[in-house]
Amino acid sequence: MNDNREQLTQQIIDAGRFLYGRGWSPATSSNYSARLDEQRALLTVSGKHKGQLGFDDVLATDLAGNSLEPGKKPSAETLLHTQLYAWNPAIGAVLHTHSVNATVLSRLVRGDRLVLQDYELQKAFAGVTTHEGQVEVPIFDNDQDIARLASRVQPWLEAHPHCPGYLIRGHGLYTWGARMSDALRQVEAFEFLFECELKVLSLSR
């Protein structure tokens, strides 16, 4: 294992412990990745507890989502990670989480997007410099056919190059960043904002 791969793998392991500890990636849910180079990514293998990841629980894939390590099975949602690396060369890490807030809010919001507006913490997202604008978070219906789901995500990405993340209804959040620390920051910001939105909804009933 070269130094770069070892460092990125450790970042994935550390992310898993942090996200599990916050209750945002329970049990074997969720998946995480980091860009290894222009043609490859490192991803968590299928079915592993994210708070207990080890070095053997991360594998390399190509950007088509194919495992480059015989005997290791990538997550079923690998294509949703590699799609992002192919879409934007600046993305260095992708995190998919299954928090209660993301899961419930995605079911409550009517329509195909959540609009975040006038929150100071919107500035935690890459490229956002003021609370005064809107951050649109698309919500895609869950689909066990990942290639079909990816085909629905792609047009949104192309039309919204500064999109910081998206939700899958009743499922969870995808967000990303140039580095793992950036992706983790965005998860934390999303979780705060999702909780705010849920409280607003509950108080307005």
Curated annotation (Swiss-Prot):
UniProt remark on cofactor binding: Binds 1 zinc ion per subunit.
Signal peptide: none
A single Gene Ontology CC term: cytoplasm
GO biological process: L-methionine salvage from methylthioadenosine; monosaccharide metabolic process
UniProt pathway: Amino-acid biosynthesis; L-methionine biosynthesis via salvage pathway; L-methionine from S-methyl-5-thio-alpha-D-ribose 1-phosphate: step 2/6
Cofactor or coenzyme needed: Zn(2+)
Alphabetized InterPro entries for the sequence: Aldolase_II/adducin_N (IPR001303), Aldolase_II/adducin_N_sf (IPR036409), MethylthioRu-1-P_deHdtase_MtnB (IPR017714)
GO-annotated molecular function: methylthioribulose 1-phosphate dehydratase activity; zinc ion binding
Gene3D superfamilies, alphabetized: Class II aldolase/adducin N-terminal domain
Binding site for Zn(2+): H96, H98
Catalytic activity line of the entry: 5-(methylsulfanyl)-D-ribulose 1-phosphate = 5-methylsulfanyl-2,3-dioxopentyl phosphate + H2O
SMART domains in UniProt: Aldolase_II (SM01007)
Keywords (A to Z) from UniProt: Amino-acid biosynthesis, Lyase, Metal-binding, Methionine biosynthesis, Zinc
Pfam families: Aldolase_II
Enzyme Commission number(s): 4.2.1.109
Role according to the record: Catalyzes the dehydration of methylthioribulose-1-phosphate (MTRu-1-P) into 2,3-diketo-5-methylthiopentyl-1-phosphate (DK-MTP-1-P).
Family: Belongs to the aldolase class II family. MtnB subfamily.
Name of the protein described by the UniProt record: Methylthioribulose-1-phosphate dehydratase
